[in-house]
UniProtKB/Swiss-Prot annotation:
Gene: lipA
Main localization category: cytoplasm
Biological classification of the source: Bacteria, Pseudomonadati, Thermodesulfobacteriota, Desulfobulbia, Desulfobulbales
Binding positions for [4Fe-4S] cluster 1 per the UniProt entry: C45, C50, C56, S284
Organism: Desulfotalea psychrophila (strain LSv54 / DSM 12343)
Source species, domain of life: Bacteria
HAMAP family xrefs: Lipoyl_synth
Name used for this protein in its record: Lipoyl synthase
Annotated CDD domains: Radical_SAM (cd01335)
Length: 299
């Protein structure tokens, strides 16, 4: 498939009917939104305009983005702003832990912008948040969705020593598309990170996610899954890429729900322990359910 990834000035392609979903509304959602706004926290659910956010909240799951809302990289698919970085907030860990308590979360996902400007890539910030949640919410499961830490495996070990329940690092797309979609990232480095997690923490549940519709070919997907399984990755999520603004990469195609179902079945046959595949699937979608499946499959 031809792939026109040049900076575009045309309007975004209209969504097919299966991708039209209203953003959440109603008193319960407003209660949660007000609570999060009052805490001064950033959730990926709201920052990325995720259509699943209220569904996840109702299932006791939320994703918090730490270390600010500006990234040192400028991935062409991502809605997170690129620009000046603030110093990490020393009170952030306690505020996240408080929000987990107030929301009554059973499962908390902690992610971050990429902070190449910090010596440890923000590893110590992840640790502080994990420890604060565990102190106030000992029964809450914790998943960390981490950047590649610029290949700093000492920083990775710092996070692993805090013993999150799931270590997630998104491969995002096939290697051919990295130069246009993920400048500053390296496909092999992401695979190596997942391998390092397995080597350093053999019992850790590992996870990755991909966006479809950027111009990848089916055979490239299969090859990427094989690379992920050779890196001993347990869980795979796949969802439709949606162009955040006209300045981001164009959607090359909309993958139909039936094809997502088929691809999910093929991925499971590659021996992933759990797979979520669908147009609205995002990295933390049904996160607790996928973790439970993987945990059960490993026994």
């Amino acid at each position: 498939m031809a792939c026109s990834h040049q900076k575009n000035e045309q309007m975004r392609v209209g969504k097919p009917k299966w991708l039209r979903r209203s953003l959440p509304t109603g008193p319960e959602y407003e209660k949660i939104r007000t609570l999060l706004k009052g805490s001064g926290l950033t959730t990926v659910c709201q920052e990325a305009q995720c259509p699943n956010q209220f569904e996840c909240y109702s299932k006791g799951t939320a994703t918090f983005m730490i270390m600010g809302d500006h990234c040192t990289r400028n991935c062409r698919f991502c809605a997170v702003a690129h620009g000046p970085k603030a110093l990490p907030d020393e009170d952030e860990a306690e505020r996240v832990a408080d929000a987990v308590s107030l929301l009554g979360l059973r499962y908390a996902v902690i992610t971050s912008v990429t902070r190449d400007d910090l010596a440890d890539g923000g590893a110590s910030c992840f640790v502080r948040v994990i420890e604060a949640i565990r102190k106030k919410n000992p029964k809450t499961l914790i998943e960390v969705l981490i950047p590649d830490l610029a290949g700093n495996w000492g920083a990775l070990q710092t996070i692993l020593d805090a013993r999150p329940d799931v270590l997630n690092h998104n491969i995002e797309t096939v290697p051919r598309l990295y130069s246009v979609a993920r400048p500053g990232a390296e496909y092999r480095r992401s695979l190596e990170l997942l391998r390092e997690v397995r080597r350093r923490a053999p019992q850790m549940v590992t996870k990755t996610g991909m966006m479809l519709g950027l111009g990848e070919e089916t055979e490239e997907l299969y090859a990427t899954w094989q690379d992920l399984r050779e890196s001993d990755c347990d869980i795979l999520t796949m969802g439709q890429y949606l162009q955040p603004t006209v300045d981001h990469l164009l959607v090359q195609r909309f993958v139909e729900p039936t094809e997502f179902d088929r691809l999910g079945d093929v991925a499971l046959a590659k021996d992933f322990l759990a797979v979520a595949s669908g147009p609205f699937v995002r990295s933390s979608y049904e996160a607790e359910k996928l973790f439970r499946k993987a945990e059960l499959a490993r026994k």
